[in-house]
């Protein structure tokens, strides 16, 4: 049994028994292919709703806790309760290779065709304890998008979500300059503070691309956490998100 609050109403849902959670009850749909030819998959919402959103993880292949958390939530929730489209990973090649960037060494979260996109590459932090961000990766080509980026844009244009929640690690906050009700709800569910930005430049980011199109995008940064502990601590929050009906 899962209980949570949505728009100040208590919602109770009978979950799939744990013994039956190995398989997905919803068949994913392909929306493209990665650089190495892996299918890009999304799980379509099963509830007709004017507030259907997109829940996204796996932009960086080495950020796996939210992928596991979302997957377990999908397999725990009865299919007919899924209110939002879900992408467990938009970067499957990097998941397989254990890298942040895709198979072309492009950071997908710096490769969206935004006004502030730069061709000069970017850097990231090797680990949470590394004092500087100095590992070099590419930012792609604004005129010839990475297949993972191009496919996601096409899917959003097709499905027209009302909002996006994008999961990352390991900064431990909810990033939403608007401090929206949805961001506050997410902060409460995942026990994370809300911030205005990540405190460094992010040219070509997915969030910027969404903002330029007036598509609300909230980034949830989980703390440095294992997949196992994510499931233990945050499964209820992921399950609640998949059913949440935000007041947009």
Curated annotation (Swiss-Prot):
Gene: mpaA
Organism: Vibrio campbellii (strain ATCC BAA-1116)
A biological process term (GO) from this entry: peptidoglycan catabolic process
Domain Peptidase M14, first and last residues per copy: 3-245
One Pfam family recorded for the sequence: AstE_AspA_cat
PROSITE patterns assigned: PEPTIDASE_M14
Family matches, as SUPFAM superfamilies: Zn-dependent exopeptidases
Cited HAMAP family: MpaA_carboxypeptidase (MF_02211)
Broad class of where this protein is predominantly found: cytoplasm
Origin superkingdom: Bacteria
Enzyme Commission number, as recorded: 3.4.17.-
InterPro entries: AstE_AspA_cat, MpaA, Peptidase_M14
Cofactor binding remark: Binds 1 zinc ion per subunit.
Enzyme class label: hydrolase
The entry's keywords: Carboxypeptidase, Cell wall biogenesis/degradation, Cytoplasm, Hydrolase, Metal-binding, Metalloprotease, Protease, Zinc
Pathway: Cell wall degradation; peptidoglycan degradation
Record's subcellular location: Cytoplasm
Any one GO molecular function term: amidase activity
Residue positions binding Zn(2+): 60, 63, 168
Family: Belongs to the peptidase M14 family.
Quaternary data: Homodimer.
Catalysed reactions listed for this entry: L-alanyl-gamma-D-glutamyl-meso-2,6-diaminopimelate + H2O = L-alanyl-D-glutamate + meso-2,6-diaminopimelate
Cofactor: Zn(2+)
Protein name: Murein peptide amidase A
